[in-house]
Amino acid sequence: VVIATKFGFAFDENGKQTGLTSRPDDIRAAVEGSLRRLRTDAIDLLYQHRVDPEIPIEDVAGTVRELIEAGKVHHFGMSEAGVETIRRAHAVQPVTALQSEYSLFWREPEAEILPALGELGIGFVPFSPLGRGFLTGQVTAGTQFGEGDIRASLPRFEREALEANLALVGLVTKVAERKNATVGQVALAWLLAQKPWIVPIPGTRRLERLDENLGSTDLDLTPEDLAELDSGSASVQVQGDRYPEAMQRMIDR
């Protein structure tokens, strides 16, 4: 078992998120709290959840380095960080992994992030590798997202954008039917085929979906399959922003 956790958000006395904080004292307090709650002596992988523009990344990386030297943390990770910030952090404390969104539904990391990670020897941990459920074939033009479902606030899932984006699901479905696999398995297998140092983290609440996701590791996509998915997804102009403006401002670029 590898234990990964994060620091980087500030909360009030009621547990409500109030913003970002990567102040050294707050990092240390977050780690102590995580160790206590997890009942462990060390955290395998400690991520900065979001880059705090108020705190130099060198100070953040230096604090994590001290925690590693103290044996409380084993590896340093970052999340939603841009290339320049990653390089600066890596110069102080080697970064083991970067978390960010990546899938057939969101291929922006291919432009700058993936080349930089390959150069620096940093692993990539894509979250939402199934496009928040979009790449499972279970989301349709008529899908209604309930209260508390983050997709209800995401521009890509607004009705007009959703209807246009379903063209992407159609091309993945075509490959899935040919391979006798599910749409989600094809989407995950495509990710796994991109780089050997990519480890997607699909979330699920259901055991059968976990089994389905694991099945993607046995799915062999041929060069022709991959080329079809690459060219097909490139031809679909995904509609709608990834996040609302307020959330987008918390991403380091």
Question: Where are the regions that the model predicts?
Answer:
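Local beta-strand N-terminus motif with an aromatic residue
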Residues: 1, 40-43, 73, 95
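A short, structured active-site edge motif that brings together acidic residues
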Residues: 1-11
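A short acidic, helix-capping loop that chelates divalent metal ions and anchors anionic groups
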Residues: 10-17, 209-212
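Active-site mouth loops of central-metabolism enzymes
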Residues: 13-28, 54
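Short, acidic/polar
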Residues: 22-37, 82-87
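Beta/alpha (TIM)-barrel catalytic core signal, keyed to glycine-rich beta->alpha loops juxtaposed to Asp/Glu
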Residues: 51-231, 246-253
